[in-house]
Amino acid sequence: MTKSVLAKKEKTKRKNEFQGRWRIIWMAQWDQEYVDEEVEGYFKFGTGGNGDFQFGYVQGSMDHRATVREGKPAIEFSWEGGDAADGTPLTGRGWGVLEGEELTGIIHIHLGDESEFTARKE
């Protein structure tokens, strides 16, 4: 097989590791009560590079890509959405690394807060 075919197969395999719903079990910036305020906090990575998330009153739609960070499967995403509490439009970016059964990473709100997070696949 050529390098490009192998790379494509490897990339597809990494995407499948993240596809699905991940329950947010910890965030550095906010307590779990806030994370689960409206719904249990989550990230959902779908097919075709799309996805969504919610924690507290913050909701967003994501564009994600599988990658590798320090030799570990990882995912990077940009997002747009809003704060349902006051209607503020929000955008941001983030990333996560697969550490065993958990996804650990950081979500950034452009010109605002950021938080480390840990999530487990449901």
Predicted regions and their residues:
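Small side chains
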Residues: 51, 92-96, 105
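Short, exposed beta-strand-loop hairpins at the edges of beta-sheets
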Residues: 104-112
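Short structured motifs
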Residues: 61-63, 90-91
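Amphipathic/hydrophobic helical signal segments and adjacent flexible N-terminal regions
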Residues: 1-50, 57-59, 65-74, 80, ...
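An anionic, turn-rich surface loop/hairpin at beta-sheet edges
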Residues: 74-95
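Short glycine/serine/proline-enriched coil/turn segments at secondary-structure junctions
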Residues: 32-33, 85-87, 111
